[in-house]
């Protein structure tokens, strides 16, 4: 069982080196490769990732769905693990993933907590333990058997945002999905330039739009109007 870790990036030179090094150290012989798929960064993300011994791919489109699909297409492992660049994984991620898959699950994620002591963000994090689609998200990372990923048709590249919700919904309709009862650490940077209430209202609005079948490009445009974020 070999794991290919796929990390989509855009201007992540402050995070990517440490993350790649952590994965390679704790992945040992079970991580086949760390693939960083860059979406035209204007900082030194590519150079930092390469120096940390990641395999770097260049995606013409700045879109996590397109970037992750490109990485998956180049991956050699039989397990794909999609990770955002601004998270900190648990040391036991390899064993956790293997245990879940050998126990009959086909895909899964972690709970998370924020790298902040704010009580209100702890409330957000608490809900990631529940098996409800609105409690999911790419920040929780996603592992999946490669054959299941291909059978489901990969990420829908029409979605510039909400690609993770869309794909996890597809998984849960046909396969067993595991939420590992451990928490990874997620950056609270989205809240630095937006209030907690503003982020929650934006997320709720976009989620309702998604469930209502609003076209992906319209959701993306509206989300950019709602939040000041990257």
Over which residues does each language-model region extend?
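A conserved acidic beta->alpha catalytic loop
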Residues: 38-46, 87
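Conserved donor NDP-sugar-binding/catalytic core segment of glycosyltransferases
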Residues: 92-119
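Acidic helix N-cap motif at the loop->helix transition within catalytic regions
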Residues: 14-18, 43-52
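Short aromatic/hydrophobic "clamp" motif used to bind/position activated sugar donors
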Residues: 80
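Cell-envelope/extracellular polymer assembly enzymes that use nucleotide-activated donors
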Residues: 2-4, 33, 166
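Short, acidic, metal-binding catalytic loop of nucleotide-sugar glycosyltransferases
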Residues: 21-31
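Hydrophobic helical membrane-anchoring modules
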Residues: 172-230
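Glycine-rich, basic loop-to-helix element that forms the pyrophosphate-binding segment
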Residues: 59-75
């Amino acid at each position: 069982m070999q794991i290919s870790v796929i990390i989509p990036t855009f201007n992540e030179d402050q995070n990517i080196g440490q993350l790649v090094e952590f994965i390679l150290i704790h992945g040992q012989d079970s991580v086949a490769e760390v693939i960083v798929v860059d979406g035209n960064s204007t900082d030194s993300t590519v150079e930092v990732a390469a120096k940390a011994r990641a395999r770097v791919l260049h995606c013409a489109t700045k879109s996590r769905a397109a970037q992750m699909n490109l990485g998956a297409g180049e991956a050699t492992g039989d397990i794909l693990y999609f990770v955002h660049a601004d998270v900190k994984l648990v040391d036991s991620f390899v064993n956790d993933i293997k245990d879940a898959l050998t126990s009959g699950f086909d895909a899964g994620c972690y709970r998370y907590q924020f790298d902040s002591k704010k009580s209100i963000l702890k409330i957000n994090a608490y809900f990631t333990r529940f098996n409800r689609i609105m409690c999911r998200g790419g920040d929780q990372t996603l592992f999946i058997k490669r054959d299941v990923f291909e059978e489901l048709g990969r990420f829908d590249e029409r979605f510039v945002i909400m690609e993770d919700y869309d794909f996890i919904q597809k998984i849960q309709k046909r396969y067993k999905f595991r939420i590992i009862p451990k928490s990874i650490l997620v950056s609270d940077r989205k809240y630095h330039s937006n209030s907690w209430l503003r982020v929650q209202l934006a997320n709720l609005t976009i989620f309702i739009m998604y469930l209502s079948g609003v076209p992906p490009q319209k959701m993306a445009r509206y989300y950019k109007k709602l939040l000041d974020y990257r």
